[in-house]
Amino acid sequence: MGGSQLKNLKAALKANGLTGQTNVKKSSKKKGKSPREFDREERQKTIERIREQFNPFDVKTNRNKKVGVMRESAAKLAVGKPGITKQAGEDQRKMFYEAKKSSKNRSGGVLDKRFGEKDKNLTSEEIMLERFTKERQRQSSTKRSLFNLDDSDGGEDENVYGEKLTHYGKSLSLEDDFDEGDLGLQHSDSEDFRLKQAGKRNMADQYGDEGLGDDALQEPARKKTKAEVMQEVIAKSKFYKHERQKAQEKLVQDIEGLDDDFESIMSELRTLPKTKPSQTEISTSTDIAPDYDIKVKELVLEKRAAPADRTKTDEEIKKEYEDKQKELEQKRLDRMNGIFNIEDQKDAGVEDLGEEFWEDSDSEEGEYGEYIKAIPDSDDDVDFEKDNNDDNEYDATSNGRPSARVIPSVPCPQIHDDLLNFLKSYPIEEHPSLVKRIVKTYQPKLAEGNKEKLGKFTAVLLRHILFLAEEDYSVNVKEIASLQNELVSILKTLSEKFTIPLSEDCRNIISDIQTRFKESQFYGLSPSDLVFFSVVGMLFSTSDHYHLVITPCLLLIAEFLEQIRFNSLQKLIFGSILVRIAIQYQRISKRYIPELTYFLQTSLRSLIPSTKGETLENKEKQEDNLSIVGSDINWSKVAPSLELHSLFSEDLEKQESIKLSVLVNNLESIDWCITNIWKDLTAFPEIINPFKDILNVAAEVYPGTSKPKQLVEKIEKLLKFQERLPLTLQQHKPLAIPSNTPKFEENFNPDKKSYDPDKTRSELNKMKAQLKKERKFTMKEIRKDTRFEARQGIEEKKKEYADYHSKMARIVNQISTEEGAEKNKYEREKKLRNTKR
């Protein structure tokens, strides 16, 4: 079909006689029906056929995949119109939606029409009484008359089915409730009551009071009518309500009367003279007060007896200790592998402090004597070992005579300057004892606020240790070293109790070190920074996967080892000590640090002189004159340890022994890394090959030492067992190509879906397939209904919003019109007034 869509449509309409010349003059002789004149139905069918031809997407043909090639022409193809079907479904859904919307809140609801259900002013008795009254009225007017023509027969307390009505297990019979005369009712309105009273008076006048016996006075019992019963019930209810109202009014009046008399009573009480206590009463009270205070203090200081635990055997104690060690080791391994138990973490601090940090805190003995013993132990108390001798240090001298210097009060320094001012008047040997005395004096159990003071003092003590590292102590090295060790021991004990303030101060120190390094590079660092890294490694866990103090320290050490240009002996010593600290950090977790490998290679190339086969890199390193030249070196006297106090000495470059110590120290570091960390890595050959070449040169240059040769032999031995295999794909068992003989069905039927000989199983599978199909269709319809309801809801909301806005606009326009009219009216009146003037 060529041409445009419009031309084709016109041609099709013209070919079917639907368009063309229509004003041709018809012959009057020809009265038969023209072949071009169609009925309305035929015309509509033709239009539908043309519409389908020009709208192929409105028709969908479903082909049967099971129909063979030979039967394809004979098969009838299923033709559907999805557009029309969809529109019909939309119309049907809209009809159901409108019906559901119209019946909303109109059917299926339960309306509580019980009397007094939501009335808060009625009591439960009044509600039940009124319900009973209405029920009896309803029964008497409707159902009762259906079964009994005489309403007066039978009991009034029975319902239409002959059942007696009860309330709380008691009969609802009203015959005797109103004969006792306790209601105070006015019966003058009742005609029967007046006749009864008149009859009684006449009989009394005729026979006298004595002549009437009980039998004569008593009239035969007459059953009350329903109107009388209802009247008495209502009267009784009103009577009780009136009594309650009277009681409430009386209570309110009494309260108001007391309020009115309150001021007069108080004024009379104020006019009374005040009596002073006698001297005897004062003396007795003063005599009792001291005894009372003594008793209170005794009760405060009296230690309450705790229940004694069963004495454990040695096996139980040993087992508990082993279990505790296993638990702590498992926790450490979890932290090292980055496994954190969020539920068990109580604080978001540096470490998760458990109960083991706060148990077994015994009371201290010191300058407070028995008073401290009597105070219960606190969880935050700090316990030092071997403190008994330290407490008596200030009480007597070495020869047994009393000491002339006694410390009456010990301050708790909160900044480092205060601690220096306190310690400057005492010799260095007494500083640890003074620090212990400060800690014991300000135990948290002694006063409120001591815990915060000791937390700050812990950070001050760390600052003091770093301050000692900055001082020049080349003269008294042993005394300063002993002092630092004792202070570090005290700091470690304090760190177990005051971890959070100590960790915060450590992070501040780390930030300060990094700032100084960024500003001045290596020259902004100091020996105290090395001491800080070393002390931190002893205070905190270095094997954790992430730690708030250790992890920043490791990053800072790696930054120093990578960015500092090690072109002087002073820098090499600094880097060697950093390597030792980093190795100490990784003694348990055994993680690889690439910056450490880089520094060890750089330091060895700087210290070992090159041979004839030197490289360009070795030549550049020789310019710094750091290499150790000489074959007559006494290697047995070379110490691998490096002294921190000699790091910044002036004659450092002249000391060849320090260079030898640095070289031996680096060789020891390489040996430790190979043995504990590098050998287990898959990249061990790539890491160790540069060291192998350098160590071979060192073995040639320094034949007097066997350390380089031993390292080379160890490397070669490890490389033999280090098998390197290229990456390969995963091995799978080869799958054979299936070679099955084609299976033909002799009695093949394309309409038959199953060839199962078991009829029961076949029917069951058929039922399952049908159920699955129906379920799928139902879910599809439910989704369509849900989407349709959502669209309808959106349209309704849009319509509501549009109506609201149009209504508001109409109101605003109306108000504006009225305002304008009033304004014009006012202007006209104003103009008229002005013209009259």
Swiss-Prot record:
GO molecular function, one term: snoRNA binding
Source organism of the structure: Kluyveromyces lactis (strain ATCC 8585 / CBS 2359 / DSM 70799 / NBRC 1267 / NRRL Y-1140 / WM37) (Yeast)
Pfam families: Nop14
Protein's job: Involved in nucleolar processing of pre-18S ribosomal RNA. Has a role in the nuclear export of 40S pre-ribosomal subunit to the cytoplasm.
GO cellular component: Noc4p-Nop14p complex; nucleolus; small-subunit processome
Primary site of residence: nucleus
Name of protein: Probable nucleolar complex protein 14
Subunit structure: Component of the ribosomal small subunit (SSU) processome.
Biological process annotations from GO: maturation of SSU-rRNA; ribosomal small subunit biogenesis
Origin organism lineage: Eukaryota, Fungi, Dikarya, Ascomycota, Saccharomycotina
